[in-house]
Structure formats: C-alpha cells, structure tokens
Amino acid sequence: MLTIADHQFESRLFTGTGKFATAQTMLDAVGASESQLVTLAVKRLDLNTGSDNILKPLIDSGVKLLPNTAGARNVKEALFAAHLSREMLGTNWIKLEIHPDPKYLMPDPIETLEAARILCEQGYVVLPYVHADPVLCRRLEEVGCAAVMPLGSPIGSNQGLASEPFLKIIIEQAKVPVIVDAGIGAPSQATHAMELGADAVLVNTAIASSRDPVTMGRCFAQAVNTGRQAYIAGLGAVSHQAHNTSPLTGFLND
C-alpha cells in the first residue's frame, strides 16, 4: 500500500484526464488502468453549467480526484486555482504546477517552492510537479509537501526517463513518496521507473494518445505492478565483466 498524507492507495499508477478523444474513452481507460488517483485541471471545471461531463462519472467510480493548477504562471495564479478547487470540489489535495513557458511547460522552481510553502501553511496536501532537482525536492519536503513529483522528461513528450540520474538521487534521499510525472511514454518506461524505487508514476499522454487507450491503460497497470515487484524482489547487481552462472570445475581440466 502507498500512503500519501491520510490516504492509502493499492494502485501505484496515477492517471490524467486530458487529451482523450472522448470523455467515455477516458473513463474506460482509467477503469482499465485500475488507477485510484486521477488528476484534472481546475481550469476545466465548470460546476455551475454542468458542462464538464467527466466529473460526476469520476466521482461515482470512487477514484480520488487530484485537481491541478495547470496553466498557472506564478504564485498568485496557483494559489487562486488551489483555493477555487477546494471550494468547488471540497478537497484540500492539490497538484501544484507552475509553468510560465507555454512552449516547453518547464516548471518554475522558484514560484513552485513559494506557492508550496504557502499552501502547506494553509493546510493543503501539496504534490508539486518539478524538475528532477534533488535539492529542490528536499526543500519542498522541508516546507511540508506530502510527496514530490519530479519529471522524467518534458510533459507529453513520451521521451521516457531522461532525468534518470537525478531521479535516483531524489528517490534515495526522499522521506516522502516520489511520483515520477511527465514524459513516460511506454509501459516499459513505467516499469523502469518503479524498478528504480519510485513510489508511483503518473501517466496521461502515453495512454490518451495511443491507438487503443483502454488496452494501453491495462498495459500500464501491469507494467507498474511488475516494476514494483521487481524492486521489492531486488534486482541483480550490474557488472562490467562476465560471471559464470555455472562455474567451470574439474572435468574440463582432466
């Protein structure tokens, strides 16, 4: 079981809700993935008009909703989105995203740390999306974040774990769950993230943009479970020289 703040999850695969061709495809893919935590952008919510046709089915399915501040460019905008999500959804959980550059969507470390500090003081369960920066992740942990979400590679790029050397350091040092977020483009990459010791992964584009999102959701569920079990079992050490699996003894020297 994975524990974040006051909540426990059996599944270590978290999913997003964007980029799916239809709302029904998204709901079916989330169900197939067995994900128990789903993130959605606050800016997509419109409870007054009921135009958001994904919210009620997600709530009815029993998954935990993690609103995110995607689109926020600074502390002020992120705080506004977080306050709005708490009012609209009745949750103090927030995925903190601040990326002022609309082209590459790189998270702003300075604004993110300040917003995280304020939100933690206000009683939020903060899960910040950040660069794979071990120093920044430690600072976020120190201000009270419930988990850290370092990127594998740029959002939606499907480039995999380009930041692997830094992810290893973060995983080694962190005292809160580490959720690899962004850039995971294939089930094999999710497996590898879990083999490194990540506590969970968040996947959206790789599922939503696949030819069959429902089947891909199922594949990612299996991949994450496989990676986690491999990590628990203990991977063999990597060596630069060969080692006999059946040592040669005696009879070849006769």
Curated annotation (Swiss-Prot):
Catalyzes the rearrangement of 1-deoxy-D-xylulose 5-phosphate (DXP) to produce the thiazole phosphate moiety of thiamine. Sulfur is provided by the thiocarboxylate moiety of the carrier protein ThiS. In vitro, sulfur can be provided by H(2)S. One of its GO terms (cellular component) is cytoplasm. One of its GO terms (biological process) is thiamine diphosphate biosynthetic process. It catalyses: [ThiS sulfur-carrier protein]-C-terminal-Gly-aminoethanethioate + 2-iminoacetate + 1-deoxy-D-xylulose 5-phosphate = [ThiS sulfur-carrier protein]-C-terminal Gly-Gly + 2-[(2R,5Z)-2-carboxy-4-methylthiazol-5(2H)-ylidene]ethyl phosphate + 2 H2O + H(+). This is Thiazole synthase. Belongs to the ThiG family. It comes from Shewanella pealeana (strain ATCC 700345 / ANG-SQ1). The keyword Cytoplasm applies. 1-deoxy-D-xylulose 5-phosphate binds at residues 156, 182-183, 204-205. The active site is at 95 (schiff-base intermediate with dxp). Its EC number is 2.8.1.10.
